[in-house]
Design a protein with these regions (language model features):
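Glycine/Thr-rich phosphate-binding loops of Rossmann-like dinucleotide-binding domains
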Residues: 42, 110, 166
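Short secondary-structure boundary segments
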Residues: 36, 104, 159-162
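N-terminal positively charged helical leader segments and presequences
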Residues: 1-63
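RNA substrate-binding interface of SAM-dependent RNA methyltransferases
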Residues: 65-157
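A short acidic, often aromatic-flanked loop/helix-cap motif at beta-alpha or helix-coil junctions
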Residues: 4-5, 141-147, 163-166
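Non-catalytic surface loops within mature trypsin-like serine protease
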Residues: 48, 60, 78-80, 162
Length: 170
């Protein structure tokens, strides 16, 4: 995503412009929200809307009311069913999770995941939930590499094995 500045014009990508003009039926003078994916949320006015071209003029930067002072990073082993992994990525983006890492374990049935597809799902969820920060999708790595490279202060592992359930305490 480009860096956005107030009082400048920005052209939406062909795909985004077509969606904005044809599907949402937006026209010149309509106001839209733009994000840079890094926490910036901007109000803009459409100044040109023709078929596959949409130009927006940024009017002002909006306050990020969802900003927090911590980072949430979730790792998961992709399931056999790709749709479940995509669903997880979508929900993570809607909840505002900062980063999702995929890992391969000794029980993994799927070791090849198209992160480009998950990134598209995340962008769609970002737009639908009016979030300003994009959820980063990291490529699949083995479990040991993931754990050894984790820089978070607190790390937790959740599992569905057995009937015993432990609760996180403060």
């Amino acid at each position: 995503a480009p860096e956005l500045d107030c009082s400048r014009d920005y052209s939406l990508s062909r795909e985004e412009a077509q969606h904005c003009v044809k599907v949402l039926r937006m026209k010149e003078g309509d106001r839209v929200l733009l994000t840079d994916g890094k926490g910036g949320l901007y109000q803009a006015e459409i100044v040109q809307a023709v078929a596959q071209t949409c130009v927006c003029r940024v009017e002002k930067q909006l306050e990020d009311t969802q900003k927090r002072d911590y980072h949430i990073h979730i790792a998961l082993a992709p399931t056999k069913n790709n749709a479940r992994t995509a669903w997880f990525a979508e929900k993570a983006a809607e909840m505002g999770i900062d980063e999702v890492s995929l890992f391969e374990s000794r029980y993994s049935e799927r070791t090849n995941v198209k992160t480009e597809r998950l990134e598209k799902v995340v962008i769609s969820a970002l737009k639908q939930s009016f979030k300003a920060n994009i959820t980063a999708i990291n490529p699949i790595v083995d479990f040991k590499t993931l754990v050894d490279g984790a820089k978070e202060q607190y790390k937790f592992i959740a599992t569905c094995e057995g009937d015993q359930r432990a609760k996180l305490k403060d």
